[in-house]
Amino acid sequence: NSWIRSLRSPKPDLDAWKPYAFEVEDELSRGGSVDPTGTVFITNRECPFTCLVCDLWQYTTDESVPLGAVDAQVETALAMMPDIRHVKLYNAGNFFDDRAITPEDRAAVAARVGGFETVVLENHPNLVDDRVAGWRDTAGTNVDVAMGLETIHPDVLPRLNKRMTADDFEAATAKLLADDISVRAFVLVRAPFMTDEEGVEWACRSVEWAFSVGVECCSV
């Protein structure tokens, strides 16, 4: 962790009460239609996992944001995206990290997004537990969880400092599917420590493996 952090430049100052970005894109839905989909990029405390390939740390704070700040950010962003049918809540880390998003804010956000057809959250496989299904039930809508797989290369994945294994990812996927929650995966086209040729080969292998364990959608 310390070596990775030593390579980083200083963080910009962020307003804890405002999302650092939001956007609307037309995306293919599970039902086959192309729908306006909003993404809220939430400002919150930095993810504790310090992954080698992550550049999202620069959009985070060093300390936990005040109670109510995350819900206020979501409210602000949604007001600017009135026509969306689906929403992604991306927080440069893990939605179920209590230091990033408090249980109180998560509950408030659940009440706020229940009217959307789909809500997508991002989370580390090792933070997948019963809270995810509980949050889905509170929101009362379809929830997808997006997790960073990156690669299944047996030597490269440990070097990314994600502090997870492919088995961890598979177990988290199985837990989510058992709770009727769909899973998305992020896969690197060329992970570090690979040649271009190896990168393409292992990206394809990783996508195929992800689908084989139940992932519905892969982003590369």
Task: Give names to the regions the model predicted.
Residues 1-8:
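Polybasic, low-complexity association/targeting segments
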Residues 10-61, 71, 78-89, 218:
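N-terminal pre-triad scaffold of radical SAM enzymes
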Residues 37, 144, 182:
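Broad gene-expression machinery/nucleic-acid interaction feature
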Residues 37, 67-71, 103, 200, ...:
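Short amphipathic alpha-helical segment that frequently serves as the phosphate-/nucleotide-binding helix
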Residues 57-73, 77, 81-101, 112-128, ...:
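Core AdoMet radical
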Residues 77-82, 109-114, 132-142, 173-180, ...:
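Acidic (Asp/Glu)-rich catalytic clusters
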Residues 99-107, 128-138, 196-197:
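Distinct, well-ordered alpha-helical segments
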Residues 167-220:
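Conserved C-terminal portion of the radical SAM core fold
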